[in-house]
Curated annotation (Swiss-Prot):
Enzyme class, first EC level, given as a word: transferase
PROSITE patterns: PROTEIN_KINASE_DOM, PROTEIN_KINASE_ST, SAM_DOMAIN
InterPro entries: Kinase-like_dom_sf, MAP_kinase_kinase_kinase, Prot_kinase_dom, SAM, SAM/pointed_sf, Ser/Thr_kinase_AS
The family this protein is said to belong to: Belongs to the protein kinase superfamily. Ser/Thr protein kinase family.
Name the UniProt record assigns to this protein: Probable serine/threonine-protein kinase samkB
Any one Pfam family match given in the protein's UniProt record, by short name: Pkinase
Spans annotated as Disordered: 108-157
Active-site positions on this chain: D313
Keywords tagged on the record: ATP-binding, Kinase, Nucleotide-binding, Serine/threonine-protein kinase, Transferase
Gene name per UniProt: samkB
Highest taxon, organism lineage: Eukaryota
UniProt key word Transit peptide: no
């Protein structure tokens, strides 16, 4: 076997006591040798197992980049470590190959000379050769020992630097006020977003499973370091319930890593698109108002800061929902401190369908807080219509996107104030907070003056008294006032599952659904509020398959049972789920008695 590539860095080995010898050429290594090499360089067993599972061999190492390492599940720290030790491996490998070739050439030359001498003095030269060989062997042994000692020292130094990486000054930027993130505590799960100069990834806490954070990785070479430091410090200084908070940061040679909470529900844009795909509309006006008011409060907080902070990219994609359905304004990558930059700030910003005219047309370099107000108005429309406010076709000559005629007068007033073409005539955040739309508990329809009640009013009554279902003209009533948990009602399936027509209760459930939906009236009463259930269920035809699959699934869960009222009870439980969804998303469908 060829001479060993490296001495052991420690007594602990991936293979235990039966440690293998690493040849000088790493391309000849099998998977076992690769794992041994990683072990010598203090890789964690869990990460070594990933190389073992993927059967990584020596000739693969040259081609393993970030994409493959991410797919294998290595953390940022381990990815950087791998790149560093592989670079060292290649350098050492080249040195050893060169020195070995020189040694072989020297030996071949000596052998030729010795052979010539042997023709003259066989006995003496044989003795001399033997002595020389012994001396050479001793020298080789000494050289090998010295090489081993040098390699041990190099590896010890390398391993020591790796262990201390999180505590070195390279991981710290004295200009940043935020705490340093212990990056080695997290493992990469998946990529969740990508921008021009940054990537957002989801990470899981290794010590606390199912605890996730988002990490925004910003390319230092592609972005100005000064701007990155400003973004981190700005985020860290902000303290508002509807603005994203920074957990910490980490820095290496190539990237800054900004850690924030992970919101599993995702963005407003994602949610509203999902709703539109099913109902051909966005959020109810009541829901839009509630979200908009909280985001406007966040905008007012930013604009009232000293110096003022302009977000410059407000849109549904940059508004997240937390577990309590509270909106969180995020992605401050385009933000700037207005006072420092208001004289010559000409950097392109904002998505075109949400951008203020003065930004899009580059008619001015004074990008004031009013550009956020325009984008805010576009975001209100986005939530209402379920897509970008221009329908994918913005006419740059138009002053504002079209406003739906069915909106209340109060909502139209806010949109008109936010979407004025000339920024000098746009309302500011404090003026908008005084708008009637953000104060009313009930809304007035613009077409006929009918009162539309907010979802909060109806939901409060629903939680307090439940519902009463009226079936037929003789006022058969089914009172569903038993103590129930709104959370359980809200967790009914939202998508129908497979329906087995051979299920023993299939026909009974189907006939029950058809029986009730064909009655007139088929109404639900929640205190003074009334909903036409027949109209609602006929309008949303998917409710039928959803009801049947959900009820059959719950029957299987509750079996065996002797309760003959189980199926009617489950049906009216489903009706309460329908009421819950209508209250949340379409409160305007209720009327008052």
């Amino acid at each position: 076997m060829d001479s060993t590539f490296d001495a052991r860095a420690s007594n602990k080995s991936y293979l235990g006591s039966n440690s293998i010898a690493l040849t000088k050429n790493f391309e000849d290594w099998n998977n076992e040798a690769v794992c041994e090499w990683l072990s010598e360089n203090n890789f964690k067993m869990s990460d070594i197992e990933k190389f073992q599972e993927n059967k990584i061999k020596g000739d693969h190492l040259e081609f393993i980049g970030d994409k493959i390492l991410i797919q294998m599940g290595l953390s940022i720290y381990e990815r950087l470590s791998f790149k560093s030790i592989f670079k060292k491996l290649k350098n050492n490998n080249k040195i050893k190959i060169d020195s070995t070739d020189n040694y072989k050439n020297e030996c071949e030359s000596n052998s030729i000379n010795n052979s010539n001498n042997n023709n003259n003095n066989n006995n003496n030269n044989n003795n001399n050769n033997n002595n020389n060989n012994n001396n050479n062997n001793n020298n080789n042994n000494n050289n090998n020992n010295n090489n081993n000692n040098n390699n041990n020292n190099k590896i010890d130094t390398f391993n020591s630097s790796i262990k201390q990486l999180n505590f070195s000054q390279e991981a710290n930027d004295p200009n940043i006020k935020a705490p340093i993130l212990d990056i080695n505590q997290y493992k990469l799960i998946e990529e969740i977003g990508r921008g021009a100069f940054s990537i957002v990834e989801k990470y899981e806490n290794k010590l606390k499973p199912n605890e996730f954070i988002s990490i925004k990785r910003i390319n230092v070479l592609a972005s100005e370091k000064e701007m990155i430091v400003k973004e981190i410090n700005m985020l860290y200084s902000i303290n508002h319930p509807n603005i994203i908070k920074i957990i910490g940061y980490y820095k290496d040679e190539h990237y800054y890593y900004i850690a924030t909470p992970y919101y599993k529900k995702g963005s407003i844009a994602k949610i509203v698109k999902s709703i539109k795909s099913k109902n051909n509309s966005g959020f109810s006006e009541s829901n839009v108002r509630n979200i908009s008011k909280k985001i406007l409060n966040a905008i007012d907080y930013l604009h009232s800061s000293n110096p003022p902070i302009v977000h410059r990219d407000i849109k549904g994609d940059n508004i997240l929902l937390n577990d309590s359905d509270e909106p969180i304004l995020a992605d401050f990558g385009l933000s700037y401190l207005a006072i420092e930059n208001n004289t010559n700030f000409k950097t392109a910003c904002c998505s075109p369908f949400w951008a203020a005219p003065e930004i899009l047309n580059k008619s001015t370099s004074d990008f004031s807080r009013k550009c956020d107000i325009y984008s805010f108005g576009c975001t209100i429309l986005e939530m209402i219509v379920g897509s970008d406010p221009w329908g994918g076709k913005r006419n740059h000559q138009s002053h504002s996107p079209p406003i739906p005629t069915y909106l209340t007068l109060e909502c139209k007033e806010v949109l008109n104030e936010t979407l004025k073409y000339n920024q000098n005539f746009r309302a500011d955040s404090k003026q908008l907070l005084e708008a009637q739309w953000f104060k009313e508990t009930s809304l007035r329809n613009s077409s006929n003056g009918e009162i539309i009640f907010s979802s909060e009013d109806i939901m409060k009554e629903f939680k307090k008294n439940g519902s009463t279902i009226q079936i037929g003209p003789v006022k058969q009533e089914y009172k569903y006032k038993e103590q129930f948990d709104i959370e359980n009602i809200s967790k009914w399936p939202r998508e129908p599952s497979f329906i087995d027509p051979k299920h023993k209760n299939y026909k009974e459930v189907l006939n029950l659904y058809d029986h009730y939906i064909n009655h007139s009236p088929f109404m639900a009463k929640i205190g003074p509020y009334v909903l036409d259930l027949k109209e609602e269920l006929n309008e949303k035809t998917f409710y039928k398959s959803l009801a049947i699959s959900s009820i059959l699934g719950k029957i299987d869960k509750y079996e065996p049972t002797t309760n003959q009222n189980l199926i009617p009870s489950l049906f009216f439980g489903f009706i309460n789920f329908v009421l819950y969804q209508t209250i949340k998303h379409y409160p305007s469908k209720f009327r008052i008695l």
